[in-house]
Amino acid sequence: MFKFHQMKHIFEILDKMRCLRKRSTVSFLGVLVIFLLFMNLYIEDSYVLEGDKQLIRETSTHQLNSERYVHTFKDLSNFSGAINVTYRYLAATPLQRKRYLTIGLSSVKRKKGNYLLETIKSIFEQSSYEELKEISVVVHLADFNSSWRDAMVQDITQKFAHHIIAGRLMVIHAPEEYYPILDGLKRNYNDPEDRVKFRSKQNVDYAFLLNFCANTSDYYVMLEDDVRCSKNFLTAIKKVIASLEGTYWVTLEFSKLGYIGKLYHSHDLPRLAHFLLMFYQEMPCDWLLTHFRGLLAQKNVIRFKPSLFQHMGYYSSYKGTENKLKDDDFEEESFDIPDNPPASLYTNMNVFENYEASKAYSSVDEYFWGKPPSTGDVFVIVFENPIIIKKIKVNTGTEDRQNDILHHGALDVGENVMPSKRRRQCSTYLRLGEFKNGNFEMSGVNQKIPFDIHCMRIYVTKTQKEWLIIRSISIWTS
């Protein structure tokens, strides 16, 4: 049974580490993992004495050197519970029903520029009428300056009154009394004191926003207050989520910049909110989000291209400094996300390491990579159910490896799936066409093929000395 003196020893270690300005990321992560495991596994254990729980809470509060932190961390023994914050509703109508997606924005007063209104406008303008029924937007005006908040609320209500009335837009504020100490914090990474205060408060801003949004929808996407959206971004997100049904994931990424476009299950938001609060002064928010993903056992980044969200602010919310970061994978105009129906994939090519066949068929930014193929080698997709295909697009090679394309190949479609000892396969194939410069694209397939398609096959027509990357296979169905 877990002894309290062991827990006390852990806190002593943590206390010593707090005095070290220069410490490795590895040591921090080690302590972080141990701390979370003990807190989550042992404090939740029904056999831990209530008195010990109280001592643990008092010790953790002392470690954070903040009497005002007691109410925030009183529920550490239940990471799935909500943080006790009484929010101020600055502009909102009661949420009548749970939505599919909540879009969360946190905003503070900037020394230069203000992009919040443009961001909200982009969210609504880039969504169809049907999509608007499935989203809610929550704006956390997190600045402690009440005059600025009042002015922003007036602007928001004037421009987006109908969205507020429809329950699609809520503007909230978490009062300053709920915040931990923000002055005199540790200067990790030799950051200046004002930057440490800024990023630490930002972590708490987002923690309170996540806490509020935990029950408003099935999924939650995190944006900044200076972002432009792609057309019909919700439809694209829904297709991606559907394609990952049955797959474990914690975070899906729809932008490669900071914490823009990070998507979560809403049931994970309470844990994430607690996590940001616990380590609010340790590091920037995007770093903490990466650690959170890893602690919940999602090893690899799952990012999708093209990006759905673009950073548009020129001046940073920190000191008004210039911030010219852009996501070069962003596409603003509507793009057609493929359907890629459920299928099994196999190849007789020599696969390199873990670049397996399935990665070419996924929406994730990954690919298949094989050693030089020979005449007659195949890459086969067998669909779970017969489909009618409208369009096919296959791309090989990458920008970095432009020679690793299919130099000589064809694309076939098949019918009459036959069972076999090793795998299902089609008995007959019909050739649709040849690859040109490593790519294949054809529309109107359903007008050319007289049967429902059971299989699709990439066929190597000539041996090549170059390796082969199949970057993406996209299929649109009728």
UniProtKB/Swiss-Prot annotation:
Cofactor(s) the protein requires to work: a divalent metal cation
Keywords: Glycoprotein, Glycosyltransferase, Golgi apparatus, Membrane, Metal-binding, Signal-anchor, Transferase, Transmembrane, Transmembrane helix
Pathway connected to this protein: Protein modification; protein glycosylation
Membrane topology: Single-pass type II membrane protein
Keyword match Protein biosynthesis: no
Entry's localization field: Golgi apparatus membrane
Single GO term (MF): alpha-1,3-mannosylglycoprotein 4-beta-N-acetylglucosaminyltransferase activity
Primary enzyme class: transferase
InterPro entries to which the protein is assigned, alphabetical: Glyco_transf_54, MGAT4_A/B/C_C
Residue spans, topological domain Cytoplasmic: 1-23
Reactions the enzyme catalyzes: N(4)-{beta-D-GlcNAc-(1->2)-alpha-D-Man-(1->3)-[beta-D-GlcNAc-(1->2)-alpha-D-Man-(1->6)]-beta-D-Man-(1->4)-beta-D-GlcNAc-(1->4)-beta-D-GlcNAc}-L-asparaginyl-[protein] + UDP-N-acetyl-alpha-D-glucosamine = N(4)-{beta-D-GlcNAc-(1->2)-[beta-D-GlcNAc-(1->4)]-alpha-D-Man-(1->3)-[beta-D-GlcNAc-(1->2)-alpha-D-Man-(1->6)]-beta-D-Man-(1->4)-beta-D-GlcNAc-(1->4)-beta-D-GlcNAc}-L-asparaginyl-[protein] + UDP + H(+)
Main location group: Golgi
Family membership: Belongs to the glycosyltransferase 54 family.
PANTHER family listed in its UniProt record: ALPHA-1,3-MANNOSYL-GLYCOPROTEIN 4-BETA-N-ACETYLGLUCOSAMINYLTRANSFERASE C, N-ACETYLGLUCOSAMINYLTRANSFERASE VI
Chain's role: Glycosyltransferase that participates in the transfer of N-acetylglucosamine (GlcNAc) to the core mannose residues of N-linked glycans. Catalyzes the formation of the GlcNAcbeta1-4 branch on the GlcNAcbeta1-2Manalpha1-3 arm of the core structure of N-linked glycans. Essential for the production of tri- and tetra-antennary N-linked sugar chains. Does not catalyze the transfer of GlcNAc to the Manalpha1-6 arm to form GlcNAcBeta1-4Manalpha1-6 linkage ('GnT-VI' activity).
Record protein name field: Alpha-1,3-mannosyl-glycoprotein 4-beta-N-acetylglucosaminyltransferase C
Gene behind this protein: MGAT4C
